[in-house]
Structure formats: structure tokens, C-alpha cells
Regions:
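Conserved beta-strand positions in the Rossmann-like core of class I SAM-dependent methyltransferases
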Residues: 28, 48, 168
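Alpha-helical substrate-binding/gating segment
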Residues: 175-179, 187-212, 216-217, 228
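Hydrophobic positions on the long internal alpha-helix
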Residues: 101-105, 109, 156, 160, ...
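Conserved Rossmann-fold NAD(P)-dependent oxidoreductase catalytic core, especially the SDR/UDP-sugar
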Residues: 81-144
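Conserved beta-loop-beta element that borders a ligand/cofactor-binding pocket
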Residues: 116, 120-124, 142, 155-178
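N-terminal Rossmann NAD(P)H-binding glycine-rich loop of SDR-like oxidoreductase domains
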Residues: 3-26
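C-terminal amphipathic/interface module of NAD(P)-dependent oxidoreductases
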Residues: 46, 50, 55, 205, ...
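NAD(P)H-binding glycine-rich loop region in Rossmannoid oxidoreductase-like domains
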Residues: 32-41, 45-100
Length: 240
């Protein structure tokens, strides 16, 4: 299957790309960095050198790639977390990707006649209430410290689920593992980066339009739906 992967050089993208290739998919990895494009080509995948905010160029690249599936794993967060001030500066940038970058990706996917759109969201945005949270529970989009992040995620999900394409939202927990900020879980709900990539591979051919919690079981968030409909395994690891 032909897949257009936005965010191919990010924390998930670096673990996800070889899994997609191993599964027999043809991957076009999107990046705005020429050096990253060279690295993707050396990894054996096609590349699209384009900025998500350049709507016309993105549409051209997407149509040229002619993907059956578009996967949105883009974020704008620091690669190395040195202090909390970095996050305060990054949140608005990340929200812009979720709001405006998503809109451009959806428009490009529609122009390319893609048949499925997969996007990463967050499983740590539920409003306080009974646990474990299911996908039907409301998100905490009220004013407060998390309003920018969760509000943008909620809008992104709405865009995907109302696009007219089959859309799958993967709500990830806090990442840990290779290429992330932490070697082990530090906050709940957590998810190993390999597990997040594993879920994305499953979503290429499984599941139905809607949301799926992708976390490790700790009693805060339910993964029953992902287990049942995706065949999700929260213990999955890439070796090495």
C-alpha cells in the first residue's frame, strides 16, 4: 500500500518507517529539511521535501505521491527537553501544526484521493472523571494550562473525523523510549514509542473511522477498543 508519512523523521517516524517498509508498504516520507530528506532516501523510502504550511506545494507533493493512506505524525516539539521553558514556547507552535497543518494535509489528501487518514492525538487530555477513560469521554478543553494543547488536539480530531475520508485518530499516552525525552515512563498514561509506531501500522489496514486510545494499561485509560478492533498489543517492541 502507498503511504504518505508526514513526520517521517520525528520520534515516531523513525521507529515507524522501517515497520511500514517491513510490512510491504511503499512509503513517501515528508520533511522540510534537506538533510533529513537525504537520510530518508538512504533508508530506502521516497521523500517529499515540503513544509506543511505551504498548502500548494504540499498538495502537489501529495498528488505526485498518490497515496492510499496519509499518516499525520507531525509535531513541533524540542528533540531534547532541557527545561520547562522550552515547552511553554513549543506549545503554540505545536498547536499551529494541529490546527493549520492538519487542514493542509487533509486538503492535500483529498486532492490525491487518499482512502484513509491517520493522525496522532493525545490520551492525556480527558476531563476529570471516572477512570479508566474510554474514547467516548469528553476532552478537557476548558481554559487552563492545558487549553492550548488539548483544544488544538480536539480541533484536529474534529477536522479528521469530519473530512469525508475514513479517519482514524490514535490517542497516544506520554512517550518514552528511544528518541524521546525519557528512557522510562514518567507520567500516566504512558506509551513506549515502539508501541505507538506499532499501533500506527495496524491502523493502515484495520479499524474504523473514530478514535483509539494507545497507551499501556495502568487503570487510567481503557485500551479495550484498540485491542478488539486493531489487534493492539501494548507490550510490542522493536528489536534492536
Amino acid at each position: 500500500m502507498k503511504i504518505f508519512l508526514a513526520g517521517a523523521t520525528g520520534a515516531i517516524g523513525r521507529r515507524l518507517t522501517p515497520l511500514l517498509v517491513a510490512a510491504g508498504h511503499h512509503v513517501t516520507g515528508m520533511t522540510r529539511n534537506p538533510a533529513s530528506a537525504d537520510a530518508l532516501e538512504k533508508a530506502g523510502i521516497s521523500t517529499a521535501l515540503v513544509d506543511v504550511f505551504d498548502a500548494d506545494a504540499l498538495k502537489t507533493a501529495m498528488v505526485d505521491a498518490a497515496p492510499e493512506v496519509v499518516m499525520h505524525q507531525l509535531t513541533d516539539l524540542p528533540h531534547v527537553l532541557e527545561n520547562e521553558n522550552q515547552l511553554a514556547a513549543a506549545y503554540p507552535r505545536n498547536a499551529r501544526i494541529r490546527l493549520h497543518g492538519t487542514r493542509n494535509l487533509i486538503a492535500a489528501a483529498q486532492a490525491a484521493a487518499a482512502r484513509r487518514f491517520i493522525v496522532q492525538s493525545v490520551a492525556f487530555g480527558y476531563a476529570p472523571g471516572r477512570e479508566p477513560h474510554s474514547e467516548d469521554d469528553p476532552l478537557d478543553v476548558k481554559d487552563g494550562p492545558r487549553a492550548v494543547t488539548i483544544g488544538a488536539a480536539a480541533d484536529m480530531e474534529r477536522q479528521v473525523l469530519t473530512s469525508g475520508m475514513p479517519g482514524i485518530v490514535l490517542r497516544y499516552g506520554f512517550f518514552y523510549g528511544p528518541g524521546t525525552w525519557h528512557e522510562g515512563p514518567t507520567r500516566r498514561p504512558a506509551v513506549h514509542i515502539d508501541v505507538a509506531a506499532h499501533a500506527a501500522v495496524l491502523a493502515v489496514t484495520r479499524g474504523h473511522t473514530g478514535t483509539y486510545n494507545i497507551v499501556e494499561e495502568d487503570g487510567t485509560v481503557s485500551i479495550a477498543k484498540a485491542r478488539s478492533e486493531l489487534g493492539f498489543d501494548p507490550t510490542f517492541r522493536v528489536f534492536p
